[in-house]
Swiss-Prot record:
It comes from the Bacteria. This is 2-dehydro-3-deoxyphosphooctonate aldolase. Pathway: Carbohydrate biosynthesis; 3-deoxy-D-manno-octulosonate biosynthesis; 3-deoxy-D-manno-octulosonate from D-ribulose 5-phosphate: step 2/3; Bacterial outer membrane biogenesis; lipopolysaccharide biosynthesis. The keyword Zinc does not apply. The keyword Cytoplasm applies. GO terms for molecular function: 3-deoxy-8-phosphooctulonate synthase activity. SUPFAM superfamilies: Aldolase (SSF51569). Keywords: Cytoplasm, Lipopolysaccharide biosynthesis, Transferase. Belongs to the KdsA family. It comes from Shewanella baltica (strain OS155 / ATCC BAA-1091). Signal peptide: none annotated. Its EC number is 2.5.1.55. Transmembrane segments: none annotated. The gene is kdsA.
Length: 282
C-alpha cells in the first residue's frame, strides 16, 4: 500500500508525513472573533512548525433545534474567509450542505468538507467533486470504516481523487459516540490521508435536550490516542470562552491552552513516525 499525498500549496498531507492541523472555530460567530482566533492559531502553529489550515462553518445546517444559531450564511461567511486568507496567508476549509454552495465556496476555500450526515448524498458528492477542490469526507457515525470505500468511489467516478478521510466517532447507543482506533487504521489501508476530528468525537449528540453535549475534559486523552496511530492530520476546534460558544462549546478546546495542547500532539506524531514499521500479520 502506498500513501497518497495531497498537495495543498507547500503543505503535503499524507499518513506518513508530519501531521497537518485543521483547526479554528466551529461556526463563524462574528468577523472580529474569527480574525482573533485565526491569528492565535497562525501564531501558535508557526511557532511550533505545524502545517495549518483554518476551519470554520458559515452555516450549521444540522443543529438540533430550529432556534439554534446557524451562522452568518454563505455570502457573509465567504467575505470573512477571504479576509482571513488575505490577512494571515492561510489555506481554508469549510463545509457545504447544498449543491448550489459548492462552486462559489470552492472559489474561496481550498478544501471543502462533506458533512457526516450527508456523506451518502450522491448529488452533493458529484457537485463537490466537479469543483476540483480537495475534499474532506467526514465518516458518518452510522457507517463502518470499510464502507468509506463507496464514498471514495463516488468521488473518483465523478472525477476527483483529491480526498481526505476524517474520523469523528461512531454511534454507541443513544446520545453517545465512541472512537474505533482500529477503524482509523482500517481507513488508512485505503492509502488516502486520514485525519482525526478529536473535537466532534467528544460529542454527546442530543445530550442537552435541544443541543449536543460534550466531554471537553477528555480532549487531550482522545487526541493523544489518535495521534499515536500515525495520521495525516488532526482536526480541532477552540474558543476563547467555550461555555458561551454559539455551537459545540462543550467540545471546544479553551483557546488559551492551544499551544501546550499542540506541543504534546506534535511530540507524539514525531515519535510515532520515527519508528520502523512492524508487520505483525506475518
Amino acid at each position: 500500500m502506498s500513501n497518497k499525498i495531497i498537495n495543498l500549496g507547500s503543505i503535503e498531507i499524507a499518513n506518513d508525513k508530519p501531521f497537518v492541523l485543521f483547526g479554528g472555530m466551529n461556526v463563524l460567530e462574528s468577523r472580529d472573533l474569527a480574525m482573533s482566533i485565526a491569528e492565535t492559531y497562525a501564531e501558535v502553529t508557526q511557532k511550533l512548525g505545524i502545517p495549518y489550515v483554518f476551519k470554520a462553518s458559515f452555516d450549521k445546517a444540522n443543529r438540533s433545534s430550529i432556534n439554534s444559531y446557524r451562522g452568518p450564511g454563505m455570502e457573509e461567511g465567504l467575505k470573512i474567509f477571504e479576509e482571513i486568507k488575505k490577512t494571515f496567508n492561510l489555506p481554508l476549509i469549510t463545509d457545504v450542505h447544498e449543491v448550489h454552495q459548492c462552486a462559489p465556496v470552492a472559489e474561496v476555500v481550498d478544501i471543502i468538507q462533506l458533512p457526516a450526515f450527508l456523506a451518502r448524498q450522491t448529488d452533493l458528492v458529484v457537485a463537490m467533486a466537479k469543483t476540483g477542490a480537495i475534499i474532506n469526507v467526514k465518516k458518518p457515525q452510522f457507517l463502518a470504516p470499510h464502507e468509506m470505500r463507496h464514498i471514495i468511489t463516488k468521488f473518483n467516478e465523478a472525477g476527483n481523487d483529491e480526498i481526505i478521510l476524517c474520523e469523528r466517532g461512531s454511534s454507541f447507543g443513544y446520545n453517545n459516540l465512541v472512537v474505533d482506533m482500529l477503524g482509523m487504521d482500517e481507513m488508512k489501508q485505503s492509502g488516502y490521508p486520514v485525519i482525526f476530528d478529536a473535537t466532534h468525537a467528544l460529542q454527546r449528540p442530543g445530550g442537552r435536550a435541544d443541543s449536543a453535549g460534550g466531554r471537553r475534559a477528555q480532549a487531550t486523552e482522545l487526541a493523544r490516542s489518535g495521534m499515536a496511530l500515525g495520521l495525516a492530520g488532526l482536526f480541532i476546534e477552540a474558543h476563547p470562552d467555550p461555555d458561551n460558544a454559539k455551537c459545540d462549546g462543550p467540545c471546544a478546546l479553551p483557546l488559551h491552552q492551544l499551544e501546550n495542547y499542540l506541543k504534546q500532539m506534535k511530540a507524539i506524531d514525531d515519535l510515532v513516525k520515527s519508528f520502523e514499521p512492524i508487520d505483525t500479520s506475518k
